[in-house]
Design a protein with these regions (language model features):
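A glycine/proline-hinged amphipathic helix-loop "lid/cap" segment
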Residues: 1-67
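Conserved phosphate-binding and hydrolysis motifs of nucleotide-dependent enzymes
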Residues: 83-86, 115-122, 155, 159-160
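A generic beta-sheet turn/junction motif
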Residues: 58-60, 71, 82
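Short beta-strand element of the alpha/beta-hydrolase
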Residues: 75-85
Length: 173
């Protein structure tokens, strides 16, 4: 199956510019490169009531989170968002635009979690951070203006894996 023409064009542009392939880089270089690529995207046009960075207590120190609050009233649902990146790359800034668009478009409070990454923090560090963030959101839902009965988990790639693993942890007690 051929690549989408836009994706192929983007990859061709990267190669022509001499971009180093990710698989040849060390994790810190990959993180810097992906954030550089994401910063080239146009900014979000979502209108939000607020976006704020915070920290919550974690199993090995503080966990950074970013809370995206849409305009609207009443207790809103929460989406706990876990970014992708193969458990090695990605952070709050990498998927900032996506979180803004999701909060504004769906009318949900998005809590993006900056879980610890490998290889510096091997499994289950990221999963423990993600589980801790969910427990925090459940406790703090009312203070956030959220409905504690409407908390969803989501993410892509590694973030989707964390979502599934948390669901299994909750099921299994």
């Amino acid at each position: 199956m051929p690549l989408n023409p836009q994706v192929q064009g983007f990859l061709t542009s990267l190669a022509a510019a001499g971009a180093q392939p990710f698989h040849t880089m060390e994790p810190p270089q990959c993180r810097q490169a992906i954030n550089g690529l994401m910063s080239m995207m146009p900014p979000s046009k979502a209108v939000l009531a607020s976006v704020r960075d915070s920290h919550i207590p974690g199993p090995a120190g503080e966990i950074k989170i970013r809370i995206y609050t849409p305009t609207g009233t009443g207790p809103l649902p929460i989406l706990m968002y876990f970014h992708g990146g193969g458990f090695v790359i990605g952070d709050l800034d990498t998927f900032d635009k996506l979180c803004r668009e999701t909060a504004g478009g769906a009318g949900v409070i998005v809590v993006s979690v900056d879980y610890r990454l490998a290889p510096e923090h091997p499994f289950p560090a990221g999963l423990d951070d993600a589980s801790t963030a969910l427990a925090w959101a459940r406790r703090e839902a009312q203070a956030l203006g959220c409905d504690s009965a409407r908390i969803a988990l989501g993410g892509e790639s590694a973030g989707a894996n964390l979502t599934a693993a948390i669901a299994l942890r909750l099921r299994d007690g």
